[in-house]
């Protein structure tokens, strides 16, 4: 595997000549990760992990620290862009059948779990009203686990409710997990270049490969520049576009917000959780909404790797994307009709994709055999 690094540094890493823009999101994710670690380091210098001082320390960063407002907003906005890139990266993998490279796909899924955990811990740190209540609701789901649930929740909280020890350990976890993500990213990249990246056609690219640099590195730079431009546009004109207004108030355990919800990038999983009126069932569905992605390499039935030549699978895929967006939208709304019904329907559609995709693959094989 070390040979891959030597090839990369010496600009000789062979890559398929026909990979499209959808293959640029990996480098964009690495850029986001570096940006998050840099801005996070400067924020950690001024942040105080204490329930009485956390909210004030964030205000101090925004108002008194030179360029603190840039650091804080860059950290928050690039977290959102990070997840946009992650979801596009995963969707690309599903569409082009890249999950058939099992080691890369499963290491990517592990990365996703750590990324979601890191983002959740980070959301709690400002100790705003929504931070506190989102942490209370989500961590309380652990109590649904039989036998061990209550003990695990008490251990995570560091007491019998969310308090100072909870914030301290969340800050420690939020600081250390990005370094775990760096390690996993290195493994992910090494595993990818061990076999080589696939291409939109889903065919073997061994006969037509070109050096990564300068051909694909310049293409990566274009997309990274586009992403950073978008980041600074949001930062300059609407820095609070993706923030929750409720989080501008200090955490108050006495007053419950009218509608508790996590950050927008977790709303799809939260929508699935909320659509099941049973605590244990909802918690299992929440876990399954992410874990089910690991089944993709084992349920692939089509003789064709990519969906590019499979119109029926394409319809199913875009229905899945529409479902994902709809769940996210309904989860941002209060728990009332018609959002309850829409949420339940889209949750069924979400899981149906992973059942229907292998069946459609099998059906398409039969259709192709009939045509031949």
UniProtKB/Swiss-Prot annotation:
A ubiquinone binds at residue 193. It is found in: Mitochondrion inner membrane. It comes from the Eukaryota. InterPro entries: Cyt_b/b6_C, Cyt_b/b6_C_sf, Cyt_b/b6_N, Cytb/b6-like_sf, Cytochrome_b, Cytochrome_b_C_euk/bac, Cytochrome_b_N_euk/bac, Di-haem_cyt_TM. Its main location: mitochondrion. Pfam families: Cytochrom_B_C (PF00032), Cytochrome_B (PF00033). Heme b b566 binds at residues 89, 188. The keyword Nucleus does not apply. Keywords: Electron transport, Heme, Iron, Membrane, Metal-binding, Mitochondrion, Mitochondrion inner membrane, Respiratory chain, Transmembrane, Transmembrane helix, Transport, Ubiquinone. GO terms for molecular function: metal ion binding; ubiquinol-cytochrome-c reductase activity. It is a multi-pass membrane protein. Binds 2 heme b groups non-covalently. The keyword Nucleus does not apply. The cytochrome bc1 complex contains 3 respiratory subunits (MT-CYB, CYC1 and UQCRFS1), 2 core proteins (UQCRC1 and UQCRC2) and probably 6 low-molecular weight proteins. Heme 1 (or BL or b562) is low-potential and absorbs at about 562 nm, and heme 2 (or BH or b566) is high-potential and absorbs at about 566 nm. Component of the ubiquinol-cytochrome c reductase complex (complex III or cytochrome b-c1 complex) that is part of the mitochondrial respiratory chain. The b-c1 complex mediates electron transfer from ubiquinol to cytochrome c. Contributes to the generation of a proton gradient across the mitochondrial membrane that is then used for ATP synthesis. Belongs to the cytochrome b family. This is Cytochrome b. It comes from Hemachatus haemachatus. The gene is MT-CYB.
